[in-house]
Amino acid sequence: MEAARLTWLQDLERTISACRGSTGYQALVCLSGGKDSLYLLHRLRVDYGLDVLAFTVDANIPDVAWKSIRRTIERLQVDHLVYRPPPELYRKLFAYLLRHQEPRGAVYTVSYVYAPLFEGAALQAATEKGIPVVFAGYSPGQPEPERMHYEFRRELIERTDWTPPGLRDSGAFSATELARFWDPRRWPSGTRFPRYIAPFHAWDYDQDAIIDRIVELDLVERRSHASPVVSNYPVNWLLMYSDLRNLGYNPYAPEFSALIRQGKASYRYWKVMAPAVDAMIRHRALLGRNVTTQMNWLQLREEELRIDQPPGAYDPPG
């Protein structure tokens, strides 16, 4: 894997150098308000000197993350495009998926429908504006490895409809709603599509070092705002609750365990925080109160958090 990382690093450096020669915005940077996206924006704007457009999809972003977004945009003085889809669309989507999960549970089911919507919106904006590359703050292991290592394949961006089959076949969503998923066939022949790259797959990744750095750079109001627990999407608390209930474990545990084994995250931190997070979720206390808030927003009852779909029902193409 280290050999692959070094190959990606060489490509990343060449790509950034090529971006400097383009006119207009030289890169679109996905900005969610989490630690990785904040640091990514800083690195590309300050360390590499790119003329970037920050891009945020305003859907289920917590107040803490919005504070960090506004603070970072002000510090770095970059242009910021916010795409705000109808809230009802996401309410409908989340509720449907939680009622009709596939066997890998709620986090997998919802995240891998939710993420392609964000990614597709970024591709749409970059294509419209002639921006050559989209950079996203995915850490190693995100998204699913079979879907992306370092960047999305050209076939995926240029020739593949991203509409999840399980949604398309459900009859619950209109053609207009499904059209929000990326489909390059809607564009005229000869359209130039951007690349979509995850720089943290190429750079040395260290979760604690990134937190230290964005605190030092004053991109967050306080250190706690850099925590992946605090800046998490509110609906994620409900997803984890559903998986603890239906699967008996938190599906983020393998991801963080892999980062710890690779020396990219702190064992000491997650040894304490992982059981604390699960306890907050189970008891709906402190940040775990988001479980109740999100269930009320989605008008869901606990018994409706069901697994009733076959494996891969919503898998995006890869």
Set out the residue ranges of the language-model regions.
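Short, glycine-rich nucleotide/cofactor-binding loops
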Residues: A27-D36
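Hydrophobic positions on the alpha1 helix immediately C-terminal to the Walker A/P-loop
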Residues: Y39-L40
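Nucleotide-activated chemistry modules centered on ATP-dependent adenylation/adenylyltransferase
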Residues: M1-G24, R43-G318
